[in-house]
Amino acid sequence: MSEHDKDLPLRADLACLDRLLSEVVGEQEGAVVSGAVQAIALRRGDERSHPLPQLAPEAAASLLRACGLYAQLFNIAEDLHHNRRRRAHQLAGSAPQQGSLPRALQRLRQDGVSFHALHQLLSHAKVGAILTAHPTEVQRQSVLDGHRAVRRFLSQLNAADLTPEEREALEAKLKRAILALWQTSEIRHFKMTVRDEITNGVAYHPLAFFEALPALYRRLEREIGQLWGEEARLPSFIRVGSWIGGDRDGNPNVDAGLLRHAVTRQSQQAFEYYLQELKSLYRELSLSSRLVEAGAEVLALAEQSPDQAVSRGEEPYRRALATMQGKLRATARLRGVELACRWDERAPYRDHRELIQDLASLSASLRAHGSALLADGRLSRLIRSVDVFGFFLMPLDLRQHAAVHEGVVAELFSAAGLEEYRALDEAARVRVLIRELATPRLLFSPYLRYGEQAEKELAIFREAAAIQRDFGVEAIGQCIISNCASVSDILALALLCKEAGLIRLEDGQPRASVNLVPLFETIADLENSEAVMRALFALPWYKQLLDSRERVQEVMLGYSDSNKDGGYLTSQWQLWQAETRLVKVFADAGARLQLFHGRGGSVGRGGGPSYEAIVAQPAGSVAGRIRITEQGEVITAKYSDPAIAGRNLEALVAATLEASLGNIPGGEVDTALFDELSASAFAAYRALVETPGFMQYFLEATPVTAIARLNIGSRPASRKSLSSIGDLRAIPWVFSWSQSRLMLPGWFGVGSAVAAYVQKHGDAGLAKLQHLYRHSPFFQVMLSNMEQVLAKADLGIARRFSELVADRELAARLFGAIEAEWRKTHDAFFAITGQAELLEGNPTLRRSLETRLPFLDALGLLQADLLARLRAEPDDEDTLYAIHLTINGTSAGLRNTG
């Protein structure tokens, strides 16, 4: 089947959505707006940069909304088409696709990996996707609800056996859903709070995770059984975690109360799901004791049942399930979790493992008495769900900046009459911290007064310890140190954990209930990470602590700040080198490395396809254990639909298996070559951002100042007032360049690096780069991700934004430098890859972009005009509203902007 034929169903869906949206816009806003939308849709090539029709303010706002809604509907249709193509592959019996479990496992089998080796890896594996709240998540929950309705009706329209009457009825439902979206405000008229973000974060579990994760485990066990002929009972090593409600560095509004609220709200979602499933099992398991026996444990549960109706006397499974529902309600009540049901006074479960025990008793009884088929359905899925989600739904990470920890430790020392902590050098800090960690005495005294920040931080750690007692130790798993630069930064966190009981002494040995995770973010910190970890592992006290964590040490790597600090190529290379060095440090120390990749949605923040990125990791850096962040609008794109969520989680697991056990060629890289490229790229990037006036240029040539005024997220755009890019958070930095369509963080510096290398080494140098591209997954992924950025960028639209800069000489100078680097980067890409055009090897993405670009370009041009108007009239709320519409529409069209 040709690529054209494969896309016919997608084009049919888009035509249907386009027609219905045109009808809605025409009926609601009139022919002028509807005609303008259709005119934009037909713009091609150079026409896309032509001026747009002048409309009255209200009509212009409607035009912006229509462009944005078209992008949203396109995303829905495209996601459904991906699901449809995957299903078509499976029905046709085609070879498994790259990134799928069957493909990954077949490769391992062909590589000679034994069942024992695979099972051993999975027995100690840990794969995590961690949801984070970010200011680039621009869509309201109400809009996402509307998207689900559109997705549902469009999917039903694709059924092959619809009658004309059924099709007409479904189209009417679809049009109503589009009309409801049109009449729903997509703009938040209030600033989001952390509570709002917590509510949004848990919304994806009933949408996708409750269905997708158990299905993924079943599929993995089935595929292993078919390929190796052995039964695989796997532990629950795949987890979805969260930062929402625990990330104080990301959001200074987070406190102990919000941490408790986050876990309680998550727990509520888990309990409601379990009770719903128990009720469904109650309806299904109507087995009569007259016809089939039940095990002793089931009968014991049945005897405790509050359901004493005569009609239930011979239905032991239903009575047992009634007992379990009562115990579960009592468990929720004990933990302060509100449920929309009556409470029960019976004994609660002490932890989720007791619930699993009861469910396992039902399963064993069914299997022992000829009903294994019943045990393998909903009951089996529920057992897996409880094992994965526990009573806390998602493990929550805590994160805070190293400087904040340092301040709290300094205050504790001062109040206790100890050394002036801030005045100590690194060696002295390590010495006094180890001294305090080795003694049972606490520094905190309830009889002394502490500063507001110290009280707040200590309260967070105490609340974390209480949450572990209430919901299980896994409910709070990691404590992350942002901007970690030294051993003392890690030990300072350890001391605060000790003050709260998260680290304690047992028989003189330190024991921790959380992982202490250094986050290396800047280029300098990445370079120093090897020395920090080697010095940490040399401490006898820390060696003992590591023993209590099965010698597993997590290290987080920051893609966003390293990119903002050093540019795209240097960031990628420094991350690679840091991983390679850490693998050796950990091997020397006999520790098990678990890397946590702080990747964003955009390429400038480490984004790109997860499968390719993981498979291209340095040898030994995965070893069955990896966590990655899922941020901003990427969460919606990846996890709002069960099939798509399942595919993304499957790719994460497949890549982990291949990177850990597979024979991946080209894992080595030419260190000298990349050192040279990195040095040139870094010099070019720093020369740009250190140009006098660059910060003024950035503030005026992007919508960053307007973004700061919008009600997108709950956290500030910067940690302090802006005087340099170092003061700016990485997310608005990347987000703003994406909105102006320059995408600078995803490519700048690569062109200069390649040009300098080829100038020095001649044709042989270019040949070496071409050879490296063909054989190095690391280099392939780097250039492939950059290619996607270049394809989405538009220099013409970026030039319009540059014209907003008041200092025309500064604008001409800086945009001239950017344009020159842009051309160098294009030349370098084509010279190395041999391609004639961008996305030559990815026709699906190329066609997708071609369809989106007319609307994306129109939104970009309008945004630039609106920014000029806002700067002339800063208090014009209508203009700010219109800018917000362009930001929403551009985000939807690009799909990964921050």
From Swiss-Prot:
Its EC number is 4.1.1.31. Keywords: Carbon dioxide fixation, Lyase, Magnesium. PROSITE patterns: PEPCASE_1, PEPCASE_2. GO terms for molecular function: magnesium ion binding; phosphoenolpyruvate carboxylase activity. GO terms for cellular component: cytosol. Pfam families: PEPcase. Signal peptide: none annotated. The keyword Magnesium applies. It is an enzyme of class 4 (lyase). Its cofactor is Mg(2+). SUPFAM superfamilies: Phosphoenolpyruvate/pyruvate domain. GO terms for biological process: carbon fixation; oxaloacetate metabolic process; tricarboxylic acid cycle. Gene3D superfamilies: Phosphoenolpyruvate/pyruvate domain (1.20.1440.90). InterPro entries: PEP_COase, PEP_COase_bac/pln-type, PEP_COase_Lys_AS, PEPCASE_His_AS, Pyrv/PenolPyrv_kinase-like_dom. Belongs to the PEPCase type 1 family. Forms oxaloacetate, a four-carbon dicarboxylic acid source for the tricarboxylic acid cycle. This is Phosphoenolpyruvate carboxylase. It comes from Chromobacterium violaceum (strain ATCC 12472 / DSM 30191 / JCM 1249 / CCUG 213 / NBRC 12614 / NCIMB 9131 / NCTC 9757 / MK). The gene is ppc.
